[in-house]
């Protein structure tokens, strides 16, 4: 994505000679001060992308194969996997092309590399936006299934889910194209940050409300069976821990990237901010880590999906 700190890796590889950098070391910022820079080796970057790619391909394949999984909830999970797949795949492609250019194996004119870089940036940005949207859509779907259980199947229908999916993809591609075209405008970066914060608040509010309802339900059962009071307390702690992990992973993996964008607007020339900008590739790696974790949280916990996945793997052998 063409923001300060990414250093336009594809274009930079045409005119610069790569130098060996430590995995973790001190680098000088613009004022000559020393700051911590975490370098992500290309091999690790590609490995993370490959793991994410395989995981999400398996999720998409399993959902597509099993008709029992053709429901609105799994439709959103499938699209989340597809978005994460594109995030990982586009970053892997950029890294691979960069390595080939640096090694002299691939020769290309600057104009061609520029166009390729723009295409990859649009794919990466649109898949990031759609991934965030589908995380929000999954939260809304689960909220409706709990608070409007009797009307769920009339509210969340497959045609409506498909229209929502289509709207998310179209909006993601459209806005990502605009963001890439006008990436040097502060308003564009602020829009991205506000969008991330909106998704974070939406997920936090919905999941906290769902946890509160679940605890109330468990408390009601405990009143009928006084001996189960300790079990109710254990349920509350387990639910709070699950919620903390879910939102914590989301914030940990996505937060640094959007902090990076925020600092570009607030303090582009400040020495401390310059140090943070140097870790842009680390922030991308964290997003890919989120693409690895998403299937574990949203997909592989389904017994039906795991059974289908096992059948797919056995048939492939």
From Swiss-Prot:
<feature type="glycosylation site" description="N-linked (GlcNAc...) asparagine">
    <location>
        <position position="29"/>
    </location>
</feature>
<dbReference type="GO" id="GO:0035556">
    <property type="term" value="P:intracellular signal transduction"/>
</dbReference>
<feature type="topological domain" description="Extracellular">
    <location>
        <begin position="267"/>
        <end position="279"/>
    </location>
</feature>
<keyword id="KW-0812">Transmembrane</keyword>
<dbReference type="GO" id="GO:0019233">
    <property type="term" value="P:sensory perception of pain"/>
</dbReference>
<feature type="topological domain" description="Cytoplasmic">
    <location>
        <begin position="212"/>
        <end position="240"/>
    </location>
</feature>
<dbReference type="GO" id="GO:0007189">
    <property type="term" value="P:adenylate cyclase-activating G protein-coupled receptor signaling pathway"/>
</dbReference>
<dbReference type="GO" id="GO:0141163">
    <property type="term" value="P:positive regulation of cAMP/PKA signal transduction"/>
</dbReference>
<feature type="transmembrane region" description="Helical; Name=3">
    <location>
        <begin position="119"/>
        <end position="140"/>
    </location>
</feature>
<feature type="topological domain" description="Extracellular">
    <location>
        <begin position="1"/>
        <end position="37"/>
    </location>
</feature>
<feature type="transmembrane region" description="Helical; Name=4">
    <location>
        <begin position="164"/>
        <end position="183"/>
    </location>
</feature>
<dbReference type="InterPro" id="IPR001671">
    <property type="entry name" value="Melcrt_ACTH_rcpt"/>
</dbReference>
<dbReference type="GO" id="GO:0031625">
    <property type="term" value="F:ubiquitin protein ligase binding"/>
</dbReference>
<keyword id="KW-0675">Receptor</keyword>
<protein>
    <recommendedName>
        <fullName>Melanocyte-stimulating hormone receptor</fullName>
    </recommendedName>
</protein>
<feature type="transmembrane region" description="Helical; Name=1">
    <location>
        <begin position="38"/>
        <end position="63"/>
    </location>
</feature>
<feature type="topological domain" description="Cytoplasmic">
    <location>
        <begin position="64"/>
        <end position="72"/>
    </location>
</feature>
<feature type="topological domain" description="Extracellular">
    <location>
        <begin position="94"/>
        <end position="118"/>
    </location>
</feature>
<keyword id="KW-0449">Lipoprotein</keyword>
<dbReference type="Pfam" id="PF00001">
    <property type="entry name" value="7tm_1"/>
</dbReference>
<feature type="transmembrane region" description="Helical; Name=6">
    <location>
        <begin position="241"/>
        <end position="266"/>
    </location>
</feature>
<dbReference type="GO" id="GO:0004980">
    <property type="term" value="F:melanocyte-stimulating hormone receptor activity"/>
</dbReference>
<keyword id="KW-0297">G-protein coupled receptor</keyword>
<keyword id="KW-0472">Membrane</keyword>
<dbReference type="GO" id="GO:0005886">
    <property type="term" value="C:plasma membrane"/>
</dbReference>
<keyword id="KW-1133">Transmembrane helix</keyword>
<dbReference type="GO" id="GO:0007200">
    <property type="term" value="P:phospholipase C-activating G protein-coupled receptor signaling pathway"/>
</dbReference>
<dbReference type="GO" id="GO:0070914">
    <property type="term" value="P:UV-damage excision repair"/>
</dbReference>
<dbReference type="GO" id="GO:0045944">
    <property type="term" value="P:positive regulation of transcription by RNA polymerase II"/>
</dbReference>
<keyword id="KW-0564">Palmitate</keyword>
<comment type="subunit">
    <text>Interacts with MGRN1, but does not undergo MGRN1-mediated ubiquitination; this interaction competes with GNAS-binding and thus inhibits agonist-induced cAMP production. Interacts with OPN3; the interaction results in a decrease in MC1R-mediated cAMP signaling and ultimately a decrease in melanin production in melanocytes.</text>
</comment>
<dbReference type="InterPro" id="IPR017452">
    <property type="entry name" value="GPCR_Rhodpsn_7TM"/>
</dbReference>
<dbReference type="InterPro" id="IPR000761">
    <property type="entry name" value="MSH_rcpt"/>
</dbReference>
<comment type="function">
    <text>Receptor for MSH (alpha, beta and gamma) and ACTH. The activity of this receptor is mediated by G proteins which activate adenylate cyclase. Mediates melanogenesis, the production of eumelanin (black/brown) and phaeomelanin (red/yellow), via regulation of cAMP signaling in melanocytes.</text>
</comment>
<comment type="similarity">
    <text>Belongs to the G-protein coupled receptor 1 family.</text>
</comment>
<feature type="topological domain" description="Cytoplasmic">
    <location>
        <begin position="301"/>
        <end position="317"/>
    </location>
</feature>
<feature type="lipid moiety-binding region" description="S-palmitoyl cysteine">
    <location>
        <position position="315"/>
    </location>
</feature>
<feature type="topological domain" description="Cytoplasmic">
    <location>
        <begin position="141"/>
        <end position="163"/>
    </location>
</feature>
<feature type="topological domain" description="Extracellular">
    <location>
        <begin position="184"/>
        <end position="191"/>
    </location>
</feature>
<keyword id="KW-1003">Cell membrane</keyword>
<feature type="transmembrane region" description="Helical; Name=5">
    <location>
        <begin position="192"/>
        <end position="211"/>
    </location>
</feature>
<dbReference type="InterPro" id="IPR000276">
    <property type="entry name" value="GPCR_Rhodpsn"/>
</dbReference>
